[in-house]
Swiss-Prot record:
Keyword Cytoplasm attributed: yes
Main location: other
PROSITE patterns linked to this entry: DAO
Residues reported in the UniProt entry to bind D-serine: Y223, Y227, R282, G312
Binding-site positions, D-dopa: Q52, R282, G312
Name of encoding gene: DAO
Designated name of the protein: D-amino-acid oxidase
Annotated region (Required for protein stability), positions in chain: 1-16
GO MF entries: D-amino-acid oxidase activity; FAD binding; glycine oxidase activity
Alphabetical list of Pfam families matching this protein: DAO
Length: 346
């Protein structure tokens, strides 16, 4: 079985690994990964890697399960020898609001979810309500190299190649194509639901910051209010979500907005040294596109599994989506097996 995965962000690499781990013991797989960007130049490398879905219920109820599966998978690795290389760690902190809001659907997934006390709220005088919980961080700059190493150990080949069409890959001999091209998926097949959600972050040295602080303002929308997420070596400052903006250059205006708002939220950051600044595009869609489809090119056909449109929560949902993609791959194998069986003469 010849399999080509297009895309080498967290979705592409994790999907490739999940499928290879599950099916290579029972079905010889010749797997290749094509991408024009590999770590450290993917959107996943820009992400702080904090596990937290959006606050609102997803349109597709399956996404709740995929988020849960990802958290459980990562939590099972938290004390493993691989945790450090994966960039995986526990982190506690705050979600802050101007006024009371309903509890999120993931309140029973994270650890120790509770409402903030009046004394805790005194620490954040600009906010009137909040939550505290323990979650996970999974830093893409570590996790993607770890996934890549696991795949190469299994004999998966990675190629720096820009794919122009599914037909090009199909005519190259692929039996199954797995489309994990993120925000660029529309270049392979029109998808009017897919848009870039531009984000910009500042990375600082602030080792005294131990807790995440995420603020939320419904008037501004998701990711447009300040957030602070400590990592293993640096702290990520953010607060930009610009739908439809394809500008990949860092913006001075956005830099100033992020810096001022984060320093107001946590005044000690004024003393932090800025060590990096990055811009990336979240693949925004009304819901994740995770489905299989057969495409025909003349007399030939190829099976395609689409897995893209994860917005700003790709690392939060990636393993659950990889497991579902593997389920779809298993159905393709079963269908191909049945199609090869001789017809019954009973």
């Amino acid at each position: 079985m010849r399999v080509v995965v297009i895309g080498a962000g967290v979705i592409g690499l994790s999907t490739a690994l999940c499928i290879h781990e599950r099916f290579s013991p029972v079905q010889p797989l010749h797997m290749k990964i094509y991408a024009d960007r590999f770590t450290p130049f993917t959107t996943s490398d820009v992400a702080a890697g904090f596990w937290q879905p959006y606050l609102s219920d997803p349109r597709n109820p399956q996404e709740v399960e995929w988020n849960q599966q990802t958290f459980d998978y990562l939590l099972s690795h938290i004390h493993s020898p691989n945790a450090e290389k994966m960039g995986l760690s526990l982190i506690s902190g705050y979600n802050l609001f101007k006024e009371e809001v309903p509890d999120p659907f993931w309140r029973n997934t994270v650890l120790g979810f509770r409402k903030l006390t009046p004394r805790e709220m005194d620490i954040f005088p600009d906010y009137g309500y909040g939550w505290f919980n323990t979650s996970l961080t999974l830093e893409g700059k570590s996790y993607l190299p770890w996934l890549t190493e696991r795949l190469t150990e299994r004999g998966v080949k990675l190629f720096h190649r820009k794919v122009e069409s599914f037909e090009e890959v199909a005519r190259g001999g692929a039996d199954v194509i797995i489309n994990c091209t993120g925000v660029w998926a529309g270049a392979l097949q029109a998808d009017t639901s897919l848009q870039p959600g531009r984000g910009q972050i500042i990375q600082v040295e602030a080792p005294w910051m131990k807790h995440f602080i995420l603020t939320h303002d419904p008037r501004l929308g998701i990711y447009n209010s300040p957030y602070i997420i400590p990592g293993s070596k640096t702290v990520t400052l953010g607060g930009v979500f610009q739908l439809g903006n394809w500008n990949e250059l860092n913006s001075v205006h956005d830099h100033n907005t992020i810096w001022k708002s984060c320093c107001k939220l946590e005044p000690t950051l004024k003393n932090a040294k800025i060590v990096g600044e990055l811009t990336g595009f979240r693949p925004v869609r009304h819901q994740v596109r995770l489905k299989k489809k057969q495409l025909h090119f003349g007399s030939s056909s190829v099976e395609v599994i689409h897995n893209y449109g994860h917005g700003g929560y790709g690392l939060t949902i990636h393993w659950g989506c990889a497991m579902e993609a593997a389920n779809l791959f298993g159905k393709i194998l079963e269908e191909k097996k049945l199609s090869r069986m001789p017809a019954s003469h009973l």
